Amino acid sequence: MAQNDRYNEETISQAINTKWAGKTVHFAKETDSTNSWIKRLAKEGAEHGTLAVAEFQSAGRGRFDRKWEAPEGSSIMMTLLLRPEFSPQYASMLTLVMGLAVAQAVEELGFEVSIKWPNDVVISRKKICGILTEMGTNGVKINYVLIGVGINVNFKEFPEEMQDKATSLILESGQEYDRNQVISLVM
């Protein structure tokens, strides 16, 4: 972990300076997946802008239920809960909005990035971030939208089958990053 990478509810909350996104932060050392966790919170009435962050996910997943794994302390695993007041047909744009937020954050750290349609952020043609958006509706109205984000920050070694497809901030720069800072830039 980066020097002084204290990573908990308090440090994440202190790093975020927004009007509403991430004003309420839930942090866990381990969860099944941040999307599944915040979906449970949404059904219990969690408010718009609630952020769930985990150090480790035992059942992290991406699009098409692909398994997503990262060693503890290596990545950002978070999900933002939204309760938008527009038709479900427009919800897909939220994936792109989050992709743009991540891309801008990583650019602020000095990297050249691009967005690979529909849900990946890449550096040097390798994936650094994946986004999984899920929605709950009553058919006509959105009850909640969950935007899950996985960013490879201090991930030092990928499995051989992923080495030509994935990268991390530390692999691209040779330096470790404070995940609190990266979250604050994204939010």
Task: Enumerate the language-model features and the residues they cover.
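N-terminal lobe of the biotin/lipoate ligase/transferase fold
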Residues: M1-Q104, C129
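Catalytic beta-strand/loop module used to bind and position nucleotide/cofactor moieties
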Residues: H48, E55-F56, E69-S75, T79-M187
